[in-house]
Amino acid sequence: MTQANNAVYTDLSVDDLVKEALQRGEGVLADTGALVVETGHRTGRSPVDRFIVEEPSTQDAIAWGPINRKFPADKFDALWARVEAFNNAQEHFVSHVHVGSAEDHYLAVKMTTQTAWQNLFGRCLFINPAKYNPAGRDEWQVLNVANFECVPERDGTNSDGCVILNFAQKKVLIAGMRYAGEMKKAMFSVQNFLLPASDVLPMHCAANIGEAGDVTLFFGLSGTGKTTLSADESRYLIGDDEHGWGEGVVFNIEGGCYAKCIDLSEKNEPVIWKAIKHGAVLENVVIDDAKHADYTNVSLTQNSRAAYPLEHVAKRSEKNLGGEPNAVIFLTCDLTGVLPPVSILSEEQAAYHFLSGYTALVGSTEMGSGGGIKSTFSTCFGAPFFPRPAGEYAELLIKRIRGFGSKVYLVNTGWTGGGYGVGKRFNIPTTRGVIAAIQSGALIGAETEHLDTINLDVPLAVPGVETGLLNPRNTWADKAAYDEAAKALAGLFIENFKKFEVSDAIKAAGPKL
């Protein structure tokens, strides 16, 4: 443990970070030993407060708009100086971490936080290398000062908080944000911009490896099942959220997991349950007087979270990477009950559904989305985190799928037998059965039937899954109502896809009216 005269705590151990957080009243310990914290009125990401500095080296490569908002370079310099001075006047914490597990693609990051618990969070989620920055690369700086209050009129921000990326200066400024997920997603966005230049596809996905070395990717928005389904006791976890796919390799961008905790149970999610122990952080989880976590209590938020290092997962890839994927799974939470539990996709269909990113917003992962559930299209299954034009990522995906011969599947973790409020959601064991069949190779070359309106091919049988569930129309009591719902969903797909300039073959791979 080192402490400089200016009260900078540098590269503390996990034990010491927990101790400092407790001494400062930043959180309390749960009965499992995990540190429990609350993040105030922001319990999810704030997309309207995220900016990218407009500067010559990147301005022509970024898809500017409501997601990637421009921020003036001079305003950034002034605000960084102001926040840094505020932070330097008090005790703070510094850790040196990597973002990206592949030797050729890591970023060396100096992470400075005002709070001990956010530094612990960063140590959970980022990579703690045996040797820091062995290649001697230029260092990125993350400055995360939770108690600084931005003044929009003075600082050029949207509110009292901000997340600003500066590629030219290799800086990420996070001010006024207690929700720690902002730090993780900011560095993901950085890698999402940088990796394509090295012919690496960055992906919002989970990944795991079977005993035979076969790799599966799970794409999907928050709440669709990436973390839960990839945490499989029969397989080795690479990671639950952020990966890069290059020639010959899938590598984790992170060194930990950030699991949604709502309704978490030891029975359905044993890997996650066991990982929540000393060194982990529980964010906005309610605990009782006995310090026992109540994962069913959503009084703080539906977006309660657990952050833990991969070392807390018994079966994991020791190198934090694997080979190229045999199976690529797009997870979608379909509110309408129209999509089947599993469809087998062609290359063109893979591109179509990757660009569409159809799913539901489940819970309040983003501030302002409310606690309910609504359908959405999120390009690349993670639109908020991809700075380049979507077509660049889609082209890289097709290149990688074609080059390795990966099989691609669309898996619905949402509703069956009717839409939200009428039907019911697929239970986790059913979806795990679908995943197991995919990973066993049972669906390769399987006999299928074609569903015309949604233009998908559905296997006639899936080992371990009830056959009556496979064609969604058969699960509806009112077949005419299903047909109408299918047409309505097809219309949403078609309308959303108008913004993409792609080949006719890809356009033809989507739903039809």
From Swiss-Prot:
Primary location: cytoplasm
Pathway(s) it belongs to: Carbohydrate biosynthesis; gluconeogenesis
Stored PANTHER family: PHOSPHOENOLPYRUVATE CARBOXYKINASE (ATP), PHOSPHOENOLPYRUVATE CARBOXYKINASE ATP
Keyword line: ATP-binding, Cytoplasm, Decarboxylase, Gluconeogenesis, Lyase, Manganese, Metal-binding, Nucleotide-binding
Organism: Pseudomonas fluorescens (strain SBW25)
Reaction(s) catalysed by this chain's protein: oxaloacetate + ATP = phosphoenolpyruvate + ADP + CO2
Family annotation (Pfam families): PEPCK_ATP
Entry cofactors: Mn(2+)
GO molecular function: ATP binding; metal ion binding; phosphoenolpyruvate carboxykinase (ATP) activity
GO terms classed as biological process: gluconeogenesis
Protein residues bound to substrate: R45, Y179, K185, R305
EC number: 4.1.1.49
ATP-binding keyword on record: yes
Protein name, per record: Phosphoenolpyruvate carboxykinase (ATP)
Compartments (UniProt record): Cytoplasm
Recorded superkingdom: Bacteria
